[in-house]
Amino acid sequence: MCIRDRHRFRVLPIVNENDTTATDEIQFGDNDLLAAKLAKIFKADLLIMLSSVEGLYESFNDQTNQSTLIRQVSKLTKDIHAMAGKASKSGKGGMTSKIEAAKIMLSMNSNMVITKGDAANPLLRLKKSVQSTWFNKS
């Protein structure tokens, strides 16, 4: 069964690009962009990105070890791209690829949220409005 058939039966497939077997010809780039492209195909209203961090941070103060979480983004500006920084050490794209995924979602007037995925019950926590960054058109 292909992904579209599964969607027709209201089955949500979990798709993960295997970095060790993906070739240049069939590579999507990373799982963040793959998720956004699939969300676009299925005209999803919302893409939930589970991450190792709570969302996009505006700044980090080395002296206080504190950072400022951006709670809402309605437009992807140069400042937002700058906040994303460079690719992460653990993954391929880090926050930069999540911003690119948000660009895809915003281009189709859909929403995206980044929230911490390694906490217990991340979707329930998101429903309770925990720390996260929402991307939506204003």
Give the residues covered by each predicted segment.
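C-terminal catalytic "cap/lid" subdomain
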Residues: 4-138
